Amino acid sequence: MEPNSPKKIQFAVPVFQSQIAPEAAEQIRKRRPTPASLVILNEHNPPEIDDKRGPNTQGELQNASPKQRKQSVYTPPTIKGVKHLKGQNESAFPEEEEGTNEREEQRDH
């Protein structure tokens, strides 16, 4: 086929750049430190900073913004809440109720 033939489809492909811009590389470097750089940073921290990293008091958690609070803290449900949920969902788990009835029958025998 000839290069100027109307049947030939040509795509515009951007030139591949093997390296990213230096500004972008610097931003990535700042955002994602390597494990080695973390070790170096931790070695240079004064002991006072490490003491402040201890367990937070309840007052500190209340003063912190929602983004600063730990999201992984588990708060167990209260007994009142569990009883309320169980009352609402009595028939929501029939297999659980069947298992309870079977255990009670086995105890009677």
From Swiss-Prot:
Residues 45-54, 100-109 have a biased composition (Basic and acidic residues). Its main location: cytoplasm. Residues 25-109 are annotated as: Disordered. Residues 55-75 have a biased composition (Polar residues). GO terms for cellular component: cytoplasm. InterPro entries: PPP1R1A/B/C (IPR008466). It is found in: Cytoplasm. Coiled coil: none annotated. Keywords: Cell cycle, Cell division, Cytoplasm, Protein phosphatase inhibitor. It holds the Pfam family DARPP-32. GO terms for biological process: cell division; intracellular signal transduction. One of its GO terms (molecular function) is protein phosphatase inhibitor activity. May increase cell susceptibility to TNF-induced apoptosis. Belongs to the protein phosphatase inhibitor 1 family. PANTHER family: PROTEIN PHOSPHATASE 1 REGULATORY SUBUNIT 1C, PROTEIN PHOSPHATASE INHIBITOR AND DOPAMINE- AND CAMP-REGULATED NEURONAL PHOSPHOPROTEIN. This is Protein phosphatase 1 regulatory subunit 1C.
